[in-house]
Amino acid sequence: QNCGSRSPESLVATPYKGTKIGKIIGVVSGKGGVGKSMVTDLLAVSLAKKGYKVGILDADITGPSIPAAFGLTEKATSNDEVMFPVYSKELHIPVMSINLLLENESDPVIWRGPIIAGTVKQFYTEVAWGELDYLLVDMPPGTGDVALNVFQSLPVDGVIIVASPQDLVSMV
């Protein structure tokens, strides 16, 4: 059986057992440096303060910034079966990012697209997220392999597109 003979639904990943996620929201941008991660952080904090259970999957593997924004310095843990996210101190927001797995978080991640896409998928399928109302996926800039993989393999309910005014002005 190949991908062409499968239904689109069969390509969608399922979260780790015991994980229940209400809505998955991708936060995307056409280029870097427009504040996408800041929007993700602020939205997560705002939702958590309103009483929603929210988690953040940092899919920006080559430029992760979510852990630093929350002041997270401890590493994610795992057992033989599953990884566990690191929780923010004040609002208890679970976060999974490549920075939380690397021995030295300042080491560059120089991986090919399929490896990065596979890692992002693992952050969804092999992390014990628990019960969440929202999972925010902080996407890398652009529309490359990772974005395509996320939108094909995760049941994304919506997207937030972050753009700077300069980008919009140039299109007019």
Where are these regions (language model features)?
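Extreme N-terminal, non-catalytic leader segments
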Residues: 1-31
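Amphipathic alpha-helical transducer elements in NTP-driven molecular machines
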Residues: 18, 63, 80, 113-121, ...
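Residue-level signature of catalytic and energy-coupling elements of molecular machines
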Residues: 21, 32, 58, 66, ...
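Walker A/P-loop phosphate-binding motif and the immediately C-terminal alpha-helix
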Residues: 23-61
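Short, well-ordered alpha-helices that flank and scaffold nucleotide-derived cofactor binding pockets
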Residues: 45, 49, 125, 152
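Phosphate-binding loop that captures ATP/GTP phosphates
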Residues: 53-55, 59-105, 110, 117
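Switch II (G3) loop of P-loop NTPases
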Residues: 78, 98-114, 121-149
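Conserved catalytic-core segment of NTP-binding enzymes
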Residues: 133-134, 140-172
